[in-house]
Amino acid sequence: MAELGAGSLLTGDPAFNYQEHELNERLKRLYPAVNEEETPLPRSWSPKDKYSYIGLSQNNLRVHYKGHGKNHKDAASVRATHPIPAACGIYYFEVKIVSKGRDGYMGIGLSAQGVNMNRLPGWDKHSYGYHGDDGHSFCSSGTGQPYGPTFTTGDVIGCCVNLINNTCFYTKNGHSLGVAFTDLPPNLYPTVGLQTPGEIVDANFGQQPFVFDIEDYMSEWRAKIHSMIARFPIGERLGDWQAVLQNMVSSYLVHHGYCATAMAFARATETMIQEDQTSIKNRQRIQKLVLAGRVGEAIDATQQLYPGLLEHNPNLLFMLKCRQFVEMVNGTDSEVRCFSVRSPKSQDSYPGSPNMSPRHGATNPHLHSTGADSPTCSNGVTPPNKNKSHNKYTGISSASSSPSSSPSSVNYSESNSTDSTKSQPHSATSNQETSDSEMEIEAEHYSNGVTESSTRIMNGTYKHQEILQADDNSVDDTCSSRQLCGGNQAATERMIQFGRELQTLSEQLCRQYGKNATHKKMLQDAFSLLAYSDPWNCPVGQQLDPMQREAICSALNSAILESQNLPKQPPLMLALGQATECVQLMARVRSGSCSFARVDNFLH
C-alpha cells in the first residue's frame, strides 16, 4: 500500500492503537466504497509535501509555524498524505485553531499536487482556501471574495468536498457556511497554510467525531442518488424488463436447485423452466452430499448421473479428490466413516437401471477397485450389479461394495419416477414440488465426537447451521476429543492408502498435462494436515472448516450445468457482478456518485 503517514502507524501504546481502530472504523462507515489498497484516504499531513517553515507533531496531525512571518513571502503550507478519492462521494475534514498566533493569517482548503507550498491555499491555480484573518475565500487567485466570518483560537473549521457535483463548502463550529467553490478539479489534497509566528492548528481526518453532522448531509445525498436510480425511465420497455427480471430470478432458483420454489415461481409468472425437474433434483442432491462432507458419494453420484463429466474435467476431479481426502481426515467421508458407523440396511440406493437420469445411463467410468487387500466401503451410490468400473486415471479409486453396507445412502428413485421433459411449463403438479424434501441426511454419530443433527432439506435449501456446523452444545466438550479419521485404525489406513492414490493421480495428471502449481499446493495443503496431532487447530486447519466445501460445491454444480449446455453461472449473479464492476469503474473515472450507488445498498 502507498504511504499512509504517521497517523496510521500502529505502536505499542494501547491508547494509540485504540484511536487507530476508531479511525479505521469511522472511515469505513463514512467512505464504504473506497478501496484503500488502490486509493488511500488522507489520514495525516505529509512530512514530505510541505514548506520548510511548517513543523509537524502529534502523529503529523498538529501543524505549527516556525518561520519569520514578516510578509506574504513567508507563508507556508502543507498537504495531506493522499488526495481525496472520488469514491468518497462526499469527503470531510476539520481543523481546530489551537492558537491564532500573532496575526491569524491562516488558510484552510484544498490544492492539487505540485502547487507551490510557499503560499497560502487559494492564491495559486488549482488551489482553494478560506482565510481566517478576513473571512474571504480564495479560488486560484490572490484576490479573495467575501465568504464567511473570521475565525480565531478555539474555532473548528470544517471543509466538505462534494465529489458528486464538484463543489466545496466550509463549516464553522458545526454550522454550514454555504458553497464556497464550484467546478472543482479532481485529485485535490486537504491543505492548510500558516503565515505568522505562534499559529498552531490540529487536523481531524476522522480520528475524532466531527463537530459538524456530516453523516446527516451524506444521508441527504444518498437519498437523492437512490431516488434518481429509482426514477430512471423505462417507458414502453416495462414489459420487456419484467420478462428479463423474471427469467433471471427463475434461472437463479434453478441454478441452485431450489426446485419447488422455481416451479411455484414459474406458475406465478407464467414462465418456462429451461431444465427438467429430474436434472435439477440430481444436481441438488449432489450438492447436499458435498456440503455434508460426503464427497466420495458426490463423486460417485456425478459419475453415474453425468458419465464422462469428471473424465473431461481432470482439474475438477482432482479438486474433488483432494477435498475427499480432507473429509477423510475430518472423519466425515463415507470411505472412512463406514469403519466406525453401523446403520440399518439401506432401503434407498441408486437404482441399477438407466432411468436414474433422463439423459444419462448408470455407467460409472471413473470408479476403480482398490483391490482385495484393501478395506472397501460403499458410498451408497454403486448399483448392485456394478461393483467395479475403471477410468483412465487409474491412480485413484472409489471403493464400493453392496449398497446395504452403506452407513447412509440417498434415494434417487422417487425423483426419477416422474417422466420430466425439458422446458417444463408452469402447470407442473404439486406432487412434483413436494418431492423437494425427499432426501434426508441421516443423524449420524461420528467417533471423533462431532454429532451431526438430522438435516431435512426442504425446497432446495439446506439448514446451514445443521449441515455445516456441529451441535453448538457439544462443541466445547468434543473439540478436545476429535481424532484423525474418528480415531479408527482401519479408517486411518484407508485414508493413507487413498493419499497414495491421490499422489499417483497427481503424478499422472502432471505427465499428461504438465506441471500445475495449483494442484501442487492443493495436495501439499491436504497432506500437511497429517503433520499435526490436532489437524483442526493447526496452520492449515482451515481446510477442515465445513464452509470450505461451498467453493468445490459451486464448481461441481457449474460444471454439471455447463455439460448440459446451460449457463455455468446464473445471469442474475453475472448482472450483479457487472453492476459492481461498473460502480468500481465509476470510481476510477472519478464519478463521485458511485459512493451512493453501491449494489449492496439495493439488496434486501
From Swiss-Prot:
Domain LisH: 241-273
CDD domains named among the record's database cross-references: SPRY_RanBP9_10 (cd12909)
Region (Disordered), start-end ranges: 342-454
InterPro entries tied to this protein: B30.2/SPRY (IPR001870), B30.2/SPRY_sf (IPR043136), ConA-like_dom_sf (IPR013320), CRA_dom (IPR013144), CTLH/CRA (IPR024964), CTLH_C (IPR006595), LisH (IPR006594), SPRY_dom (IPR003877)
Composition bias type Low complexity, residue spans: 397-420
Pfam families according to UniProt: CTLH, SPRY
Function field: May act as an adapter protein to couple membrane receptors to intracellular signaling pathways.
Protein name, UniProt field: Ran-binding protein 10
